[in-house]
Amino acid sequence: MPYPLGHQREVKKKIIESARRLFNRHGFDNVSLQQIMAGAGLTHGGFYSYFRSKADLYADVLGCFFTDPNWKSCWDGVEVDLTSTDVGPQVVRAYLSRQHYDDVENSCPMVALPSDVARSHKAAKHVFQTVFLAMVSALERSLHAKKRPRHDSGQALAALCVGGMVVARAMVDTALADELRDACMRVALDLGGWKRRRKGRSGKLRVPSRSAK
């Protein structure tokens, strides 16, 4: 009996979802293909029907976060409406939120995997760059500050968000990590020319689904 239409696409999504959680938690080098496939409820032998290598899977894990915003499972914990003219401050508030800090398995791969990417295959580096530049572009669209070129500000904001969360996650002192995140958020919102919400109002921001179109 043939598989239903879309079966292969759904299975591939399950594999990437499993890999994303495991890579975020343990890193690229410390996760086996067997673990990834088991996490998707599949056997190891089926892996190569969907990916040429672990590096190719890694590239897809990185790419799903910003390049496919309709794939909501890749946005758990950091949800942003990319159609909004207010997307810049949404990205900053959500990215540097306590929710994103706490949700390691579902966080942005750029936070969990930068050192792995630096040591990885060129394909993963290209995808990391694409994802980072997509974030820069989203931030640029709602910049109000005119003190420096928009692209410079967009790059600085993206680096402040990603780098700030990487350093916060590395802190053993949670209070210090919160202080660091808050400082990065405050500086980023000032740099973008965006008003800062009162404390405690940052959180999930909705991603439009395909069905909403």
Where are these regions (language model features)?
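N-terminal intrinsically disordered/low-complexity leader segments
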Residues: 1-8, 194-213
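Helix-turn-helix
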Residues: 14, 18-56, 60
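Amphipathic alpha-helical segments that line or abut small-molecule/effector binding pockets
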Residues: 17, 85-100, 155, 178, ...
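Hydrophobic alpha-helical connector segments
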Residues: 60, 74-107
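Short, basic, alpha-helical segments at the C-terminal edge of helix-turn-helix-like DNA-binding modules
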Residues: 63-69
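Amphipathic alpha-helical segments used for helix-helix packing
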Residues: 87-91, 101-129
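Hydrophobic/aromatic-rich alpha-helical bundle segments in the mid-to-C-terminal region
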Residues: 122-130, 142-199, 213
